[in-house]
Amino acid sequence: MTKSIYILILLLCSSFISAQSDYWQQHVEYKINAQLDTSTHIIKAECGIQYFNNSPDTLDRIYFHLWANAFSNKTSSFADQAIKMGMTDYYFADDGELGGYQEITVALSSEEGELQLIYLDDQKEIAHVPIKGGVPPGEEICLIFYYELKIPNYFARLGKSNNLYNMVAWYPKPAVYDRNGWHTFPYLSMGEFYSEFANYEVTLSAPKGNTIAHSGYETKQYTNNDYQYKETRLENAHDYAWFASPDFIIEEEKVTLNNNQIVHVKIYRKPDDTIWPEAMLYTKQVLIYMADYMGDYPYSTLSIVQGEDSGLVGAMEYPSIKIIKNVRASDALEYYIAHEVGHAWFYAAIGSNERDESYFDEGLTSFLEQKYIAHYHEGDNYQNNKLPSFLLGSDKPILRHFTEGQICRHLHQPLTTPVAELSTINYGLNAYQIGSTLIAHTESLLGFNKVREILRSFYTEWKFKHPIYKDLLSHIERESKINLSGYNDILAGHAVDASISKVAGGTITITNKGKSEIMMPLLITYEDGTTERENVNPSQQDLILEKYKNIKSAILDPDQTSLDINPENNRYPRPGIGIRIFTGFDSPGKKDIYLSPLIGYNSYDGIMLGLSMYNSTFPAKNLKWNITPFYGFDSGQLVGQSWISYDTKFKSDKIRKIQYRLGIKSFSIANNEDANIQLRYIRIDPCITLHHYHNSASKLYSKTSLRQLWTGTDISYLEMDRFTQNITRLTHNRYNFDKLQPNELEVELEYNQYHAGSFLDSQDYLKLSLDYRHGFLFGKHRKLDIRLFAAKFLMNSQRQSSSYNNLLAQGSIALLNQGFTDYSYNDYYFDRQGQSKRAYRQIGYHGGGFKDALGSANGRIGQSNDFAMAINLKTHLPFGQAKLPLKLFFDAGYARTKSFSADPLKGEVFYSGGVMIEIGDGLFAFHLPLIVSQKISDIYKSESRNLLSKITFSMDLHRWNPWELADDYIF
């Protein structure tokens, strides 16, 4: 038996040694001479590349990245991604703001004549150089590139911003060739790089008066005519960046680390900044802390550069130099410095493939940054410090809440998803939050010292190499003897949901309700006051633990690092009820109920004071409810609304979830002050909604709902009669959140059966309507919105008698919408009967979407008992300040109807145009019609309306429903 164990150990060791000995990577030596012309914004350069083939293969070509060409046109992958991220600066840039290689040739250093540079496609970001005879294993080849590069305006990393030149991705780089072949990919803003380790000799020149910050260390500096020169070196790095500006001053200091390593630190900043003088202190603190945690800093220099505000990237790491945007808060500066300096270990020295595994370097670096912040700020979390304490609920980082919310809503994408296919939110959560949380969870399992020891040994083993994430997990398992197979479940996108399902005496049962079998810490408190902490691995079968003492309480995942989507069931006893105000992230130790005092108003209830009570904010729960009673001081009535909903979620490529909802609301609708009688309505609406699945990166969202509405409206002050409706609505909504051309479609089929007590026998109709909206972005922050609407009665028992919308005949198609046309009580109106001079100018955007308010006395104008259609236009001004909320609008509509049952159908055209002020994309708006059709004009004249009395307003609270936004926001 003992001999067998020895043999097994020998086999394992030999396998590990063999795997290490099989590892190889290519090597590059660069010799670059570059000159910056600030008058033309052009770099002229020679780039010598000595490429060492350490692979077992003969290479007949070498692939190169020419990433600066991403800024040469507006059809590049970078341009497409910028739009998907909601950034339009590059799309609307002038041709003169673009850049890229103007000229580029390549030759062998040992021969005259040019070599071919064959581009992979028209984008010219990826090219290969055919090598005659190839480069055999163990051999090398020397190439020289001659090029002129026009520097674009600053959009992402590379470019000119004010006086600052950001010189990154500025030279041809060989693509990585490893055991999986060539790794070629286009330049992206969201998604970084993978390059060969190299040594650099770089000579930089810029006009006198500019200060040059650069990777590596300086070997010589001199001036010649109007230019200054710097000769620099950098070893064991996979990139080289530099920055030039006449605005920099330099602070420098030699910092001795605790291991006696000396690092030359430089801060390049603007002289008049009030925050950046603290940068040196923060940099020294971070450098010393992280070197203590991880081991030797990999270079002899460290430079921090103050950047500008523009562009898509807030801060970027390069070997031995970091650039940080012009932050305006001290804690933000410290946070950015901590993160970017942390990249010296994970990114600069550990050269993982950032395009395939962004969560590797960003996750480990975020973990280091969090350790630093916690050390220097007594456990503070930078994310949470940005919010008031009443919102937090716990010390769990807010981005971890967002991560769990994405997973709960089945909008999360697996970490194995290629970066180019990720949505913006999922990229950020995958790379920074999940990546760091996995290591934090490892620390929760193993403890601070053990994880520090493991990361240090991993750094030593893989320094200046290209590991993959699997290498890290294997290293942790080997050094800790724990099973991390559950981490692969998380990488694949499986949800974590473990539960303490039963505790009886000293027996505890743990059930795995999710699909991820991740190991978790379990903290037990016994009835005698003692505690025990152990690691458990919930599997698909119940895990039953027998303890020797009675259990008082137990917490699974006490540090909240497992990404468990249902932390409430991680505790015994189950959480009690906690009362909180307004909103916030749920507390894991309590079932939170939120309270929000509210104030409201309508013409019949008067000023209303209310209290909203609800159980869910973010992340949204499956079971959600809201109770919001109001007291109306004018009516003396208790009014308000409530709803409850439940979500059933699916891991499907067809349906994301099904939501079941029941709502009820009731408010006053009229009053008789003399008789002291109030009329009110009540609405009850059960609904089932299918939320269809769309890839999270697609910007698409759609749902189909079946809603049954019952409304009852008092119509007699004698309280003897009530108007009732039974409305069935089948509605399909489709949204496309594209930045350049957002659009949405609603198709609805509505059947309504209604009657009015003794006044009217039961009547019914069937109506089909279509609402399509399309936006066209025609400049930075300038958009033209077009809306098309059409509706037709397919069947109608009463409209054949020419009845229009009133208490006895519902559902007219209205080109002009106000409270009295909102027959199903969908929206919020201050005055539904058009009787209050203060509130009757409120209009709605449903139906024809006209911006005029004619009042209930003119209710027949623009209504149809047969067919109607409309077009609504609104646009920013093509000149002036684009961010001003001032817009132009124009509405045109056609309504076909008949005045008497015997009359033929007759169509009529209406139009109205003017100016409007819109806030929050339709949340609130004020409209002033200036040009109107004859019939509308006649009413204005008959009522002697002046310009101010034509002003109308609208509010669309449904569009900004906080519960729907929290549940169904799309990024």
Q: What is each stretch, according to the model?
A:
Residues D356, E362-T437:
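Acidic/His/Gly-enriched intrinsically disordered linker/tail segments
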Residues K74-T88, E148-Y200, E253-V255, S562-G589:
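Glycine/proline-rich low-complexity spacer/linker segments in large multi-domain proteins
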Residues S21-D22, A213-H214, N483-G486, A498-P558:
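Beta-strand-rich binding/interaction modules
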Residues V176-D178, W182, M190-A338, F367-Q370:
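Hydrophobic helix-coil surface modules that form long, contiguous segments used
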Residues F52, M87-N163, Q540-K549, N566:
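A surface-exposed beta-strand-loop module
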Residues M520, E532, V536-S539, I544-R656, ...:
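Outer-membrane beta-barrel initiation region
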Residues I599, K657-N676, I684-H691, D714, ...:
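C-terminal outer-membrane beta-barrel translocator/porin domains of Gram-negative envelope proteins
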Residues E421, N426-A504:
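Amphipathic alpha-helical substructures
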